[in-house]
A protein has these predicted regions:
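Short, compositionally biased serine/threonine- and acidic-rich segments at solvent-exposed termini, linkers
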Residues: 2-34
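Short loop/turn motifs at secondary-structure boundaries
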Residues: 25-151
């Protein structure tokens, strides 16, 4: 009897997040008490092919000055912790034009919505089915949630 062993490569990938990063599961939103910011669950979730991500910048007690500017980035990562996309701001308020990538953008206190078309940045290729992380950074303070693409 002859046995044949197939050589295989198994990769276990863990998304590395700082200890103070909030990762929510089963909740509708995650909050950062330092900046008063909130990151909501994307909708729809799971999604195919596009999704929206609602978030709030500033809040009581950090938003006593409505003209205060916050440096904001929203990025999407695969489970290998590789950045694959930057959503765009959708329907922004009067001080910011919508459609701009949410990378080091200065925003005032308020409610915002980001849009992701489900495509990998720099390509016209749709992201594969699976679990992804999206991370909001407000003045360097991160909040992370997960989302699922289902084809």
């Amino acid at each position: 009897m002859k046995q044949c062993w197939a050589g295989g490569l198994f990769v276990l990938a863990l998304l590395a997040l700082p200890a103070d990063t909030a990762v929510a599961q089963g909740q509708q939103s995650s909050r950062d008490n330092r900046t008063g910011s909130e990151l909501k669950q994307n909708y729809p979730n799971p999604f195919n092919p596009e999704t929206r991500i609602a978030f709030r910048i500033g809040g009581f007690p950090t938003c006593t000055d409505p003209s205060r500017q916050y440096r904001v980035s929203l990025r999407i990562f695969n489970l290998l912790a590789q950045q694959i996309a930057v959503p765009v701001l959708q329907g922004a308020g009067s001080n910011v034009a919508g459609g701009q990538p949410l990378e080091n953008m200065f925003l005032t206190c308020g409610e915002y919505t980001a849009y992701w078309d489900g495509k990998v940045a720099g390509t016209n290729r749709e992201a594969a089915s699976g679990v992804y992380a999206y991370r909001l950074e407000v003045n360097g303070s991160p909040i992370t949630r997960k989302m699922t693409i289902r084809k």
